[in-house]
Curated annotation (Swiss-Prot):
CDD domains: ATP-synt_F1_alpha_C, ATP-synt_F1_alpha_N, F1-ATPase_alpha_CD. PANTHER family: ATP SYNTHASE SUBUNIT ALPHA, MITOCHONDRIAL. Produces ATP from ADP in the presence of a proton gradient across the membrane. The alpha chain is a regulatory subunit. It comes from the Bacteria. It is an enzyme of class 7 (translocase). Keywords: ATP synthesis, ATP-binding, Cell inner membrane, Cell membrane, CF(1), Hydrogen ion transport, Ion transport, Membrane, Nucleotide-binding, Translocase, Transport. One of its GO terms (cellular component) is proton-transporting ATP synthase complex. HAMAP family: ATP_synth_alpha_bact. Gene3D superfamilies: 2.40.30.20, ATP synthase alpha/beta chain, C-terminal domain, P-loop containing nucleotide triphosphate hydrolases. Belongs to the ATPase alpha/beta chains family. This is ATP synthase subunit alpha 1/3. It comes from Syntrophotalea carbinolica (strain DSM 2380 / NBRC 103641 / GraBd1) (Pelobacter carbinolicus). It is a peripheral membrane protein. The gene is atpA1.
Amino acid sequence: MDIKAEEICAIIEQQIENFDREIEISEMGTIISVGDGIARIHGLNRAMAGELLEFPGDVIGMVLNLEEDNVGAAILGDTHHIKEGDSVRRTGRIVEVPVGEALIGRVVNGIGQPIDGGGALEGAEARQVEIKAPGIVTRKSVHQPVQTGLKAIDALVPIGRGQRELIIGDRQTGKTALAIDAIINQKGQDMVCIYVAIGQKQSTVAQVVDKLKQHGAMDYTIVVSAGASEPAPLQFIAPYAGVTMGEYFRDNGRHALIVYDDLSKHAVAYRQLSLLLRRPPGREAFPGDVFYLHSRLLERAAKLNDELGGGSLTALPIIETQAGDLSSYIPTNVISITDGQIFLEADLFYSGVRPAINVGLSVSRVGGSAQVKAMKQVAGTLRLSLAQYREMAAFAQFGSDLDAATQKQLARGARLVEILKQPQYQPLPVEKQILVIYAANNGYVDDYPLTVLRRYEEELYSFLEHRHGDLLKDLAEKKAIDTDLEARIKAVLAAFGEQFTP
């Protein structure tokens, strides 16, 4: 076989030209201590705050402390097999989670990995978890309503798209139930819902998911769960992962609703993390930046202006109080960050007023401008009437001989309280709420005993659906009560009153 020197030269030249010397440079560090979900690593001098690190066994971590001779990192996963002396690699990426349509209907953990056995997330894109909230110029004032389907909220503490409304109360007062009802009521409202469970029992989260499935709400809901058995770093990151998923829809001109259940446990997880990282403790042993922890999370809920698509992200954070104490550290922080609060009271809950909303202490600072005009018309005097009723009821305990006007006001107030009660998982469309509140406010139920008002309400809805569907339709379309519509409402309520037997 005859090989020519020219051919050999040509082959060598070609190989030299095509030679691509790829060198993968990665910065490695060594674990000097590990425990309680925290690792201290030596040798990562160029690590960034919030950067992802790769630990042995495909576990990821997040840089939280940058110190002179080491970095403190939170391990976002199982720590049992990670030991002192192991190597850790920088990724050069800030913590990211998957976002997009692929997440709807799924249950994921605090870093967006599916935990519902439904397979991998197809077609999801990654987004950084820690990003800046929209500024003032990019926002628009809240003007569209979020209907929760609960009479007491939609009438007295209305919520608008882009608002942050705190749900606060002791344990077992119906905080989660209220948020779940709000999610169920978003069916057909073009709203994506995100439920973030922080430090909850896995059995409780499974019950919530089951309830959402029963009511067809998982078709538009994402559940992010960082359970009580998960390490503190995962509980800390979960709300940020949830809000990042919500921002994807907000930034694409859609509307999203996010529930954080609850931020008290989130603050406790962050306190644990901070103390393990040896950050100096402050009031109640919380670190100094615990206010910023929640403010930077809740400021990301916003109503964007029309140039940016007009999307919105509405937040319903939940806070658990101890014995009704609103003045402790975390409750006061979150009250000052949010645009209003719904205060649930244990005494009301146990006396049968459910949802157990204390109307006097609950307020919506920006929701009034988003409330449906018809609801504003019928519920305008409702708060005042309930306040007067409570004052008179307290006064009437001391005296038995009350004049007729006082007795009438007490009777009306008791009926208003009764009408605002509502069973769980039965949210109502706003037009039905308007009609029943109109009936109670204008004396149509004054002559009935309190015990029959629940039946009155149910039969009224049935009567309206079967005989006066056009009235409900007109109310839903017009969203305001004019003279003609009011005359029709009066006629319908009078006709129903004639056939109703207490």
